[in-house]
Amino acid sequence: MKRNNNKGFTLIELLVVVAIIGALAAVGVVAYNGYTSAAKKNSTKSIHANMVKYVASELAKCSIDAQPFGTAGESASVECPATPSTVVSFLTGDDSPLQDKDPYQGDAAAASAGGGGGSPEGNVIMTPDDSASTITFNTQISDATSTDDLETVISTE
């Protein structure tokens, strides 16, 4: 008498395993997309806050002892007292100490000069107002469900 001792899985068992793996992968992709969206939003908020703090601290240094605005020892800097236009030109130029990248467009700089229009997501647009001695920082943060606008105004005096 022959015994048929087949070892292995049936087609149904294999299909069930493939279906389970597919369902888990679908859940993982959705969770990962949510994670990356939240990371971009948090990174953009952090970049906005860091730029505002950097400019405010450099302006405070200017008011104390009239040191050049910018990184110590840099060839390109702004002499104090600085006008909003010269500060924004310096910070958005090639020699800018601000090296952050836009989280939504990885190779683009996170800081740019603006004239008051809408800001593309992830980009901190600095708008100088020489008559009011202020710099306005505008940043747009968005995901699939909402769009938030951050705006901060600091005085250069």
Predicted segments, located by residue:
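Periplasmic/extracellular, small/polar-rich flexible segments of pilin-like filament-forming proteins
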Residues: S57-E157
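Amphipathic alpha-helical segments typified by the pilin-like N-terminal helix
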Residues: K2-N50
